[in-house]
Amino acid sequence: MAKDIKFSADARAAMVRGVDILADTVKVTLGPKGRNVVLEKAFGSPLITNDGVTIAKEIELEDHFENMGAKLVSEVASKTNDIAGDGTTTATVLTQAIVREGLKNVTAGANPIGIRRGIEKATSAAVEELKAIAQPVSGKEAIAQVAAVSSRSEKVGEYISEAMERVGNDGVITIEESRGMETELEVVEGMQFDRGYLSQYMVTDNEKMVADLENPFILITDKKVSNIQEILPLLEEVLKTSRPLLIIADDVDGEALPTLVLNKIRGTFNVVAVKAPGFGDRRKAMLEDIAILTGGTVITEDLGLDLKDATIAALGQAAKVTVDKDSTVIVEGAGSAEAIANRVGLIKSQLETTTSEFDREKLQERLAKLAGGVAVIKVGAATETELKEMKLRIEDALNATRAAVEEGIVSGGGTALVTVIDKVAALELTGDEATGRNIVLRALEEPVRQIAYNAGYEGSVVIDKLKNSPVGTGFNAATGDWVDMIETGIIDPVKVTRSALQNAASVASLILTTEAVVANKPEPAAPAMPGGMDPSMMGGMM
C-alpha cells in the first residue's frame, strides 16, 4: 500500500490537530462542574459519561495524521488508567498543554532534544515534591473522602470505605448491576488468584473481555492436560448437566486447548481453562485450598488419582466464577464450613511456626483468600444509560481509593500541581533545557485553569490568587469558595497525580521530537455508475 509522508513542522502540526480535537473533547469533563459527553453506540442507547479514558478510546479521526496524534493522547489516558485507575482527564489536559507550549518553542527555533531533557528534569522534580508533600491515608473517613471526590457522590464514598473495611485494603471488590434502582453493598465468600483464561475465545462478555460462569463445576488438577481423551468421559458427564466448567490445571495445551475452544465457540458447552496458581509445593497447597473452598478433590498422582478415571463427584462447585485475562474470582464455593474452618486453622498454626518472612507473607495471602470475602457493590439506576455512567464513576473511585491507600494523598482540584511549581522553578537549567522547564511550569497550572473554566470562573484569576495563598489552600470549584483542601475533603491520590504528569510528559516529548510521520494513503473511492443510465434498463443485460 502506498504511504503518505509529512516532515518537520507539517508532521507535528498535523498530529497536534489530532491532540487538540481529542483533548478538547475530554477536558470539558474535568472537575466537580465538568460536563458530560455523549458517545454513540452501534447497538443500544448512547453512553453518557464523564470518564476521560472511555471518551478517548471512542475517538477515531478521518485524517490519518490527525488520528495518530489523537491515539497518542488516548494512550496517555489508557496508561494512566492502567497504573492509577483515575486521573485520565488530568493526564490529557497536561499532555495538550505541554505539546501546545512546546510546539511554539520548536517552531521558533528551539532544539526539541534540549526541550525534552528540560521537560524530563522538571517532571522528575515535580514528582519528587509531590511524594514529599503526600499525606498517608488511614481510617474509614479518609478513605470515604477520596472515593467521594472521585465519584462525585458521598454515598459511593461510604460504600467503598465500608467495603475496604470489611475485606481489607487489598481485598476483592467487584462492581455489578443491581436489579433494583438502589445501589447497595453486599459481601460474599470468595477467593481470587492471579491466573487468567488461556484463550480469549473463552470470554462470555466481549466488551469487558471477561468470562462469567454461573453455578459451574470446577476441575482441579496439578497435571498438564494435553490429550482431550483424558478428560473426555468427564466432559460428557458435565455436558449432560448443561452447567459450565472451569478447568484449573498445570497447563492446557496440545490438542486439548483448541478442542475446548472450538466446542465453546460452537456453543456445545461453556468452558474456561486457567493455569493453577503458584509454583511447586505452594501450588499444591493453593489447589488444596481451592478444593476445600469448592467441595472438590485435587486430581493428583500424590493421591493415586488419574484424570481419565475422574468423575463428576470429584469436581468442585461454586455459585459464580469470573475470569479475566489476569485473574480468577471464585464466589460462594460449595465446600463445607467445617472443612474451611479446619483449613484456616491449619494455615494459622503454620503462620505461628514459620521463621521465613517470605513464607509468612504467602501464608497470610492464602489465609486472606480462604477466610476473606468478596465485596460486591451492586449499582442501581433508573435507566440503563444512567447505570452505565454510574458504574464507570464507581470503578474510577475504587481505583483512586486504592491508589490513595498505596501512596498517600495531596490537595485536590489541581492544587498540588501548582504547589510544586516553586520546586520546579528552582531548577538551575540553561538554554533549551530551561525552555523545557518553563513549558512544564505553564502546564502545571492547566488543570486548575480548566476546572475553574468548567465551573464558570476565569482560570487566570484563580491561578493568580492560588499562587499567593497559603500552602494547602485551594479553590473549591463546586461552591466557589477558597478552603483548606485536605480539611474539606478535596483530595487526590498522589499516585494518580504523579502518573498523569509522568505519562503526559513522556508522550508530549515524543510528539515534540517527531520529525517525520508516515501514514497509509486513503484508498480511492469506488467509481460511480455512469450517469444517465436508467437502472431498470439493466434487466435486458442479464
From Swiss-Prot:
GO molecular function per UniProt: ATP binding; ATP-dependent protein folding chaperone; isomerase activity; unfolded protein binding
EC id: 5.6.1.7
Coiled coil segments of this chain: none
Keyword Cytoplasm: yes
Amino acid composition bias (Low complexity), ranges on this chain: 526-542
Protein's UniProt keywords contain Isomerase: yes
Enzyme class, broadest EC rank: isomerase
Residues binding ATP: 29-32, 86-90, 413, 476-478, 492
Enzymatic reactions: ATP + H2O + a folded polypeptide = ADP + phosphate + an unfolded polypeptide
A Pfam family matched in the record: Cpn60_TCP1
Region (Disordered): 523-542
UniProt subcellular location: Cytoplasm
GO biological process: protein refolding
GO-annotated cellular components: cytoplasm
Keywords annotated in UniProt: ATP-binding, Chaperone, Cytoplasm, Isomerase, Nucleotide-binding
Primary role: Together with its co-chaperonin GroES, plays an essential role in assisting protein folding. The GroEL-GroES system forms a nano-cage that allows encapsulation of the non-native substrate proteins and provides a physical environment optimized to promote and accelerate protein folding.
Family in the record: Belongs to the chaperonin (HSP60) family.
NCBIfam families noted in UniProt: GroEL (TIGR02348), PRK00013.1 (NF000592), PRK12849.1 (NF009487), PRK12850.1 (NF009488), PRK12851.1 (NF009489)
Subunit structure: Forms a cylinder of 14 subunits composed of two heptameric rings stacked back-to-back. Interacts with the co-chaperonin GroES.
Name this polypeptide is given: Chaperonin GroEL
